[in-house]
A protein has these predicted regions:
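Serine-dependent carboxylesterase/thioesterase catalytic core
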Residues: 4-8, 15, 25-37, 43, ...
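Flexible, glycine-rich phosphate/dinucleotide-binding loops
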Residues: 13, 41, 102, 147-148, ...
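Short amphipathic alpha-helix
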Residues: 19-20
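C-terminal catalytic-base region of ester-bond hydrolases, centering on the histidine
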Residues: 133-189
Length: 189
């Protein structure tokens, strides 16, 4: 099994994806890496964080092929990495409630790392075009009740395979049983 790299979302850390990791371990998957980045203030641009991710992958992951499971903002960082810095063959990218089409909440932000998450931002349009043209094997999970990526449909990629889960909030969608099942069934293919 190719390794799985976890990337957390804005203001979070490694605890955010532990339930997913625990589920996958129970299913016999044990090859994991965790990218932890400082994002508490939204000061860094996505490109800068994607460069840090690229360095992390280069320095820590020996395997040639990897799968990425990225939560919320982590999904946008992963796409930025794939567009500009890809140094490994990413077989599959799973984004969980990532603001592919922006979030209305970002309209209130002025920090560089959050301004790029506004609906119709230049960055998100560029990443959408990149995903369309590069045919990345992408899987997106979203909930219509997401108040962080608002409205919730903005968290689905227009390309690849989508899974709607009826979790009551943004964080519950990461830990929803249907999310675990969707990831597992598609990662072992």
């Amino acid at each position: 099994m190719d390794p799985i790299l976890f990337i957390h979302g804005f203001g979070a850390g490694k605890k955010q994806y532990q339930p997913i990791k625990k589920y996958l371990k129970k299913k016999g998957i044990n090859n994991f890496y965790e990218f932890d980045y400082d994002n508490k203030f939204g000061l860094a641009s996505f490109k800068l964080t994607a460069k840090v991710l690229s360095n992390f992958i280069e320095e820590n992951i020996e395997e040639e092929n990897i799968n990425i499971i990225a939560i919320s903002q982590g999904g946008i960082i992963a796409l930025e990495y794939l567009k500009y810095f890809k140094n490994k063959n990413v077989k599959k990218l799973f984004t969980l409630c990532s603001p592919h089409s922006g979030s209305m909440l970002a309209n209130m932000a002025v920090l560089p790392g959050l301004v790029d998450l506004r609906a119709n931002s230049k960055l998100l349009k560029e990443l959408e075009t990149f995903v369309r043209d590069s045919k990345i094997d992408i899987y997106s999970v979203y909930t219509p009740f997401d108040l962080m990526v608002f409205p919730g449909w903005r968290a689905r990629s227009k390309y690849g395979k989508q899974k709607i889960v009826f979790a009551p909030t943004h964080p519950f969608a990461f830990w929803w049983p249907a999310t675990f099942k969707f990831i597992y069934e598609n990662i072992i293919k």
